[in-house]
């Protein structure tokens, strides 16, 4: 009997994320330019965008996905902006691929990323200018470009 090689079973975070989206359906695609949109349009301090100075800024601490969902659903105008069209996503560490998803996938995809991929998550809409940062340190921020 040969010993198992644990590395041969390894899949990258990108592969895991894309497989998850494939299981949801076909209303998504890999999307270049998500990180560039964020870098061009937001001011950064260190590795994170400064959102506190922007319109409609809201923040909350979270311990799990349910806390994030409660934060968003308790702010109907925020939730409405997020769910009003296609949503772009990029992580800042383990995932290299940006993706664009249908809004109907948002909560399932958010839950998957929070529970499975340890990185800061950026959801945004280049078309309408909103951004949602879900930080690994346990806080979430939402803001809209002026």
Regions found by a protein language model. Give the residues of each.
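Structured alpha/beta or helical-core interaction and ligand-binding surfaces enriched in interleaved
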Residues: 1-146
